């Protein structure tokens, strides 16, 4: 287990959480793990919070592929990325040390805005209007013009991200073993003059989605990358593809993806 000895904790500090993390660090050290203060030195990155904190941990630490991410929920929380509760951290340490875990590999999407440096998303990218006016987007798949969307916005999600914002927009929950990404509409405008598909659709991992923002007053839409807004202005084109970057997480052997979906929603 030498390659898994360095552990880093990512969390939002406050007085109560500082005390809990101090105790977690003590337990880690007592079990032979080396607590590090720089995430780049870690082979295990632990986020403490809900799914949102987990997404931030992955983004803030650079979508590393050479380490294991794991999520710990705070009291009373539930999540799809978090297998452990802050009150049973001892069980997590025992599972890590005795390899009573399974490694999951979550795909990411690559988002390129205006042809510039790409961003990566584990959950989804969304684009929304910032004014009281529909946003107009030409939607192309592999260079083929599929539709012209008018409405509040669009969401492009990974399979694991399908349980987030996309689901609230009537998107499907996608099995993470399916290699592809989902495109969902947010409040599309459909009448005798304007038509869109009116439903979510799923693209194969080899497809390229191109979104062209028509400049009709919506020059500064909100772009959200997972749970963080992008400061980019005057967005004209957004290209989305599946990426080869894979985020490795661990799960308890008796806690499947669909068990977590049921526990979260049903």
Curated annotation (Swiss-Prot):
NCBIfam families cross-referenced by the UniProt entry: PRK03501.1
Entry's family note: Belongs to the NAD kinase family.
Purpose: Involved in the regulation of the intracellular balance of NAD and NADP, and is a key enzyme in the biosynthesis of NADP. Catalyzes specifically the phosphorylation on 2'-hydroxyl of the adenosine moiety of NAD to yield NADP.
Alphabetized Gene3D superfamilies for the sequence: Probable inorganic polyphosphate/atp-NAD kinase, domain 1, Probable inorganic polyphosphate/atp-NAD kinase, domain 2
Amino acids binding NAD(+): 51-52, 123-124, 150, 152, 163-168, 187
Reaction catalysed by this enzyme: NAD(+) + ATP = ADP + NADP(+) + H(+)
Places the protein is found: Cytoplasm
Pfam families hit by this protein: NAD_kinase_C
InterPro entries for this protein: ATP-NAD_kinase_N, ATP-NAD_kinase_PpnK-typ_C, NAD/diacylglycerol_kinase_sf, NADK
Domain of life: Bacteria
Coarse class of the protein's main subcellular location: cytoplasm
Active site feature: 51
Organism listed in the record: Oceanobacillus iheyensis (strain DSM 14371 / CIP 107618 / JCM 11309 / KCTC 3954 / HTE831)
SUPFAM superfamilies: NAD kinase/diacylglycerol kinase-like (SSF111331)
Protein name listed in UniProt: NAD kinase 2
Any one biological process term the GO annotation gives: NAD metabolic process
EC number(s) per entry: 2.7.1.23
Keywords per UniProt: ATP-binding, Cytoplasm, Kinase, NAD, NADP, Nucleotide-binding, Transferase
One term under GO cellular component: cytoplasm
